[in-house]
Amino acid sequence: MTQFRTIVADPPWRYENRASRAAAENHYPTMSTDELCELSVVPEHAARDSHLYLWTTNSHLADGLKVMAAWGFEYKTSLVWVKPQMGMGNYFRGSTELVLFGTRGGLPTLRKDVRNHFTAPRRAHSRKPREFLELVVASSPGPYLELFARCSGDADCACSRCLFGWATWGDQSGGNPSQGVLETRHGRPLCGRCFQPVPKPKRGPSGVWCSAACRTAAWRERRG
């Protein structure tokens, strides 16, 4: 089993606010905090000494810390993505996004001159900027794994797999870290499309699906 020294995760956070939840689920299936904590892929694939970059929203800060601890990492600091464009918000207009940085074991960063913020414009929903990936490569050693990755498959795609050859897993990534599937800590496989436990999985060449409908939907998304 491949052990990764750097893992990036961009979970599909589920919102309690009905409007925000509907907005997210228009783009992809979401997962609850407890469901994310149950995932075994990070503890199983993280090297003894490794780094975790965990994307979270400002409203999911406490949830992000809970998930990081459940995956066996100790929170150290945060990175901030500053977006020139102003977004929505319940109290203040959002223009930032957080990345929680945690460590397992005693792995230091590669450099000591990297700032804890970066500025980059918004991309398509949930897609993260190239500037972030460059920061990760400058700060943390490989091999690299990205969970919940998104790959457009276009010639100008700027995902971690297309740019840097990372191992990826996600319903729109087309990759898998171990030729297997995401599982809960109890060994139950999760559907590669809706992330729900699958009692009788339907296996395909690029993942496991709870139904033919999910398998077809994932194929269509990859095809664009």
Where are these regions (language model features)?
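BZIP DNA-binding basic region
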Residues: 183-224
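Class I S-adenosyl-L-methionine-dependent methyltransferase catalytic core
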Residues: 1-184
